């Protein structure tokens, strides 16, 4: 369980808004960095997820992940290669969830593939965008739980846009104060997010 406390000189201090702290150092105008929406228990959290894609110096490309399941990353990279045609088989791929947090929720799938595509193409992701969605093997974007809470957290922290699965859109289409962008598949999501 993610503890919402910070260690200060006076001891442990309750952290009232973990999302704010965890995304406060996100670099602007750098490829491979995206804000994702996850849920810990029933509490929504926004986190920064980073990907670095670089040509390999060895015969076999390296795949490394910190904070996310390695097998899930391997699956998502295969989907990117097969469904999008991203030629990453000869590229080292490093994935990191900033803050040392471990996430075991499929809603971060879309963030992983967007960050990888961003790094590979060297196209930064707008800093006012959040992404959430499970990615299926055919490249479809599947619905996530607690979509209303995720969007409320994005609004609270001043984000202007959130990319969500189309199957979640009906429940939140009337929400004001944030642009909600529904997507059906991976190609559509990448094109929307990477064009700004």
Give the location of each predicted region:
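Peripheral, non-AAA+ core regions of ATP-driven protein-machinery
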Residues: 3-39, 43-196
